Amino acid sequence: MGARASILSGGKLDEWEKIQLRPGGKKRYKMKHLIWASRELERFALDPGLLETSEGCQKIIRQLQPSLQTGSEELKSLFNTVAVLYYVHQRAGVTDTKEALDKLEEEQNKSQQKTQQAAADKGVSQNYPIVQNLQGQMVHQSLSPRTLNAWVKVIEEKAFSPEVIPMFSALSEGATPTDLNTMLNTVGGHQAAMQMLKDTINEEAAEWDRLHPVHAGPAPPGQMREPRGSDIAGTTSTLQEQIQWMTGNPPVPVGDIYKRWIILGLNKIVRMYSPVSILDIKQGPKEPFRDYVDRFFKVLRAEQASQDVKGWMTDTLLVQNANPDCKTILKALGTGATLEEMMTACQGVGGPSHKARVLAEAMSQANSAIMMQKSNFKGQRRVVKCFNCGKEGHIARNCRAPRKKGCWKCGREGHQMKDCTERQANFFRENLAFQQGEARKFPSEQTRANSPTSRELRVQRGDNPLSEAGAERRGTVPSLSFPQITLWQRPLVTIKIGGQIKEALLDTGADDTVLEDINLPGKWKPKMIGGIGGFIKVKQYDNILIEICGHKAIGTVLVGPTPVNIIGRNMLTQIGCTLNFPVSPIETVPVKLKPGMDGPKVKQWPLTEEKIKALTEICLEMEKEGKISKIGPENPYNTPVFAIKKKDSSKWRKLVDFKELNKRTQDFWEVQLGIPHPAGLKKKKSVTVLDVGDAYFSVPLDKDFKKYTAFTIPSVNNETPGIRYQYNVLPQGWKGSPAIFQCSMTKILEPFRMKNPDIVIYQYMDDLYVGSDLEIGQHRTKIEELREHLLRWGFTTPDKKHQKEPPFLWMGHELHPDKWTVQPIQLPNKDSWTVNDIQKLVGKLNWASQIYPGIKVRPLCKLLRGAKALTDIVPLTAEAELELAKNREILREPVHGVYYDPSKDLIAEIQKQGDGQWTYQIYQNPFKNLKTGKYAKVRSAHTNDVKQLTEAVQKIALESIVIWGKRSPKFKLPILKETWDTWWTDYWQATWIPEWEFVNTPPLVKLWYQLETEPIAGADTFYVDGASNRETKKGKAGYVTDKGKQKVVSLTETTNQKAELQAIYLALQDSGSEVNIVTDSQYALGIIQAQPDKSESEIVNQIIEQLIQKERVYLSWVPAHKGIGGNEQVDKLVSAGVRKILFLDGIDKAQEEHEKYHNNWRAMASDFNLPPIVAKEIVASCDKCQLKGEAMHGQVDCSPGIWQLDCTHLEGKVILVAVHVASEYIEAEVIPAETGQETAYFILKLAGRWPVKIIHTDNGSNFTSAAVKASCWWAGIQQEFGIPYNPQSQGVVESINKELKKIIGQVRDQAEHLKTAVQMAVFIHNFKRKGGIGGYSAGERIIDIISTDIQTRELQKQITKIQNFRVYYRDSRNPVWKGPAKLLWKGEGAVVIQDNSEIKIVPRRKAKIIRDYGKQMAVDDCVAGRQDED
């Protein structure tokens, strides 16, 4: 104590004792205050010796000041004492504590201003300064509401236009990742954009982690860890860590890095919202240059390019894409002109006044030489000739005509003029121009079908140029009687004018007809017209005759130096020429991916060199035909491609594995439910079978879906990058191709069908059956019409597959004029059969059974039972070999079917083959079958012949409706009418009874026994029951009679169901010829009441034998465990020592069913005899039953104590919302401001009403404030923060926000103030909206959840003995044994355990229960543990 008295000495101590504790107070500082201060400093781990100097006091002040806001009163007193002592050392002459504190604050403010001024002098932005306070610490200043408001306004007003990026860059200058996340959180409502941004951030973070791997071993002491990608994104790093990284030595600018990632994502978003390319920005003819510049730079900002590239775009594209008037002026300025000089020079260009000035200037320059006639008008003839347009007077470099594709010498594409081998320039080839008025050759129909639109010029004959266009729009086929010129190349035609042949361009955009280098008769007058690149002077000739494509027109012709001869509208209208934009012949079907899914991104696997070579050749050919097209790296999708050899050929076939794309593509409705059958065909005089070539490749694919079909042809040893393609047509192997093709083909055939109603066309995929009653010549004419019709739509019908003469091969059948059969079937002879061989064999026999009666396959199918590999060898049983030999014999002689006659009735005859197999024939005339078939399906393990016969009848009736459209044929059945009627009346549930007659075809079907419908008077009554233990498989079966007789037998390796059946068998054995049997087993009752005569179960077959021997049997059912006399007695009799009555017996089944159906707790408690507490716990632990929808990454924690908090905005005010995650119960209120103080007060109110364990919030400044942290600490609440833009984080409260606003909108007119409407909406949501689990309201649900939680905890406390056990367990995703966990309940099916604080239900088969041996477990060899294992 004495040592500390030396802090002040002499005059300083006297000055110390003069200072007042409070202004105007009587108490003054004493020596005891110094001694107390030194002791307090030791408590705070500070050196008391620091009090002896002013520098030491300053260090103490720096250390204590950050803790003042949350510190205790003792801490504040200590700070005040040290501050006064600091000024005593300084001899500042303070009079009281307040004066010392005011001086200290003033001094600190001056220091901070100096720091800020120094930073400003250095040119560093101070938007979000990380400044050094008086204590030398780096302190972060949070974003201001004004900055956030400016950012929100930018997004709302600009809607992700290019201006957003520079604005974001300016507002976020110097920001930390936490600041950036705060900015993004404020615009989180733009979910699509934020999802794109999140994807970009994740990709960049992963790339950062890849380029900056974690160093092995622990970090050196005192050194900060290196930031990971998630640290930079602010999700796994704290604000303090970010500040240390940004201000460290050397610094890691995590804020700038994260900002760069966000700007990359914003670029992608801007490109999506503003999809205009800089190349598309061109100045309009009359658009002011200033407006053009504004548009240009707006799009330039959105371009993802470096500054150098953007500079090049400004220098070149700005001038290049200007209109001709401005371009002339800009080129005159030179390359060094600034933007201001350009805008000044082009001011006013493009308006009417500018046009007038130019025209006047041009006219003033017209001299007498221009007005001279004929040859004087032309200048001196030049010898140079243009390779581009073929005209003399200029070279190709200066040509103003559009650039021609291909070689300038020969006109062919694929090489340049310097590489051309032709000697003579022949660009205007003869096949490109009309000759003698005929249309030039245009692209094939298939190419047009593959194009999105087919634009063409038509020269019409007739007075109504619109009639044909209208007819085409109605769906009829356009007539080809007049020339058509498609616009895939320039519409150049040959014209005749003044006896001279010229080539000219048909230009629907030109008013006048302008020709070059031609002498015309008659007088002319001078004229100036605006042309390409400026004004040209021309001679105007009137009433000139021109012949175009065989059509004559008279009108004005202008002659002058035009780059290309033009036929304008003044001539085109006279000959009826129209510009048509017909829709593509085949309308594309729009296709989308399944909601929430993206396209496939499957890597291409390696391929051999020969496969790569084959695929390259195939794709080159397909690309030429327009079926696929090359794509660049901008397409992120890929599907693997491979090649296989064609059957019996050395050629290769390309296959694309669309498995992943098929999973992601929307579902399609199958437009054709099955394949047509020849038995349903009507007999026709003439028949033709056609095949559509390249069927799928003739139908265009939706342009927006093409990108998802991308695939890559790799190179050997990665010599070059892979060649990327995407499909333009329907791909083979894609799930949508069949449905879209069938739909398209139906639409195409519809006009032909309507025009030719007497012709029958059966269409299945690319196979067409065409039948008619026309003579063969007329029929073939119609076939050619059909082929021509299909060709116009782009579908070819190759001659190779055009079948004109019988027999016709169609759909696997062979068609003759008056009969049909299946194509020849050869059954293989093998010494050994694999599973795959037998599968193919059964398939062939099933196919043959449609016309070959008597074929049986059941013995062969029995060989395939069990899980076997395709290559496993299967020995044939004697039964199977016999059936195979019989089937060979049946197939030896060919059998034919006949065609359907609509005027006659159908007859179906069924025969029993034995062993559960049936065969049938459908015919109209005896011995002339339309088709045959077989039935051998066993729908249940216990059946009888009558039941199988009725199932066969049902199958044939359905088949009749499908093939012939008839409800039912007349049946001939091998069963007595009395037997049939008995079964039909009692057991067959149907709305119709087929017409049938008895056929005495052995073996006949009969019922072997019949159960009574009423109890038998005078007969003994047997109460039967059975029980078994699931673990030991031991059980008992027995009965008790109404006369006191009883019997029990012990069973091994049994189940409850088998024991119940065994009890019935005992009763039948020990009873007389008449007996009443009562059981409580619905399973046993259902089997026996169906009156089976055969079964796969041995015990059921034994029961059937006993039933056949009885005269009369009555079987009844009573509910179990309801106190019914005889049933209760026999239940006790068989349960003794067998059943363990534990309520958790059914918990595993309940869990499995809940995982499938998500039923509520009441249903599980009822169905599985579970206590409500356990059933509710199963529901409570299922996150799918607590949330609407499912989180994209993981599941939301639905424990009873978790709440999510968020602020939402409405009518300019802030609504703070808290939602109980498990029940969706909400608390909400309008708060004055979005501050930490208001939020902390709300949290304390919430904690005072409900048990709050965890609150989950976003990273908003109010939630991260010290006030909220303090209130959470005081109330014992754990606070968790969400990951920005992760739907898992705040999904529940976000959806509740939307729901709350919706309800507020419904009641807003009933309340004057918003805060009233909010409370009304909360009441409605919590207590007036029911649904979800148990049909509860949210208020009822939260009370129920909390009550259940309390009951469960109290119930656990009562279990004492069982807690002496420990459980080791495994969960489904991890094979490692976990534990030990505490055992709470044990049942036969599952156990309830507690692992740490989490209660889990684990299936019994995944748990090991052992005694708690304490420390001995660690050293013993666990022998005793294995002995005690349950």
UniProtKB/Swiss-Prot annotation:
Its EC number is 3.4.23.16, 2.7.7.49, 2.7.7.7, 3.1.26.13. The keyword rRNA-binding does not apply. The record marks 128-129, 359-360, 371-372, 426-427, 434-435, 482-483, 581-582, 1022-1023, 1142-1143 as: Cleavage. One of its GO terms (biological process) is symbiont entry into host cell. A zinc finger (Integrase-type) spans 1145-1186. Residues 7-31 are annotated as: Interaction with Gp41. SUPFAM superfamilies: Acid proteases, DNA-binding domain of retroviral integrase, DNA/RNA polymerases, N-terminal Zn binding domain of HIV integrase, Retroviral matrix proteins, Retrovirus capsid dimerization domain-like, Retrovirus capsid protein, N-terminal core domain, Retrovirus zinc finger-like domains. Protease: The viral protease is inhibited by many synthetic protease inhibitors (PIs), such as amprenavir, atazanavir, indinavir, loprinavir, nelfinavir, ritonavir and saquinavir. Use of protease inhibitors in tritherapy regimens permit more ambitious therapeutic strategies. Reverse transcriptase/ribonuclease H: RT can be inhibited either by nucleoside RT inhibitors (NRTIs) or by non nucleoside RT inhibitors (NNRTIs). Residues 14-33 are annotated as: Interaction with membrane phosphatidylinositol 4,5-bisphosphate and RNA. Mg(2+) 1 binds at D691, D766, D767. The record marks G217, P218 as: Cis/trans isomerization of proline peptide bond. The active site is at D507 (for protease activity). Residues 273-359 are annotated as: Dimerization/Multimerization of capsid protein p24. A motif (Tryptophan repeat motif) lies at residues 980-996. Gene3D superfamilies: 1.10.10.200, 1.10.1200.30, 3.30.70.270, Acid Proteases (2.40.70.10), HIV Type 1 Reverse Transcriptase, subunit A, domain 1 (3.10.10.10), Human Immunodeficiency Virus Type 1 Capsid Protein (1.10.375.10), Immunodeficiency lentiviruses, gag gene matrix protein p17 (1.10.150.90), Integrase, C-terminal domain superfamily, retroviral (2.30.30.10). Residues 438-475 are annotated as: Disordered. Residues 12-19 are annotated as: Interaction with host AP3D1. PANTHER family: ENDOGENOUS RETROVIRUS GROUP K MEMBER POL PROTEIN (PTHR41694), RNA-DIRECTED DNA POLYMERASE-RELATED (PTHR41694:SF3). This is Gag-Pol polyprotein. The gene is gag-pol.
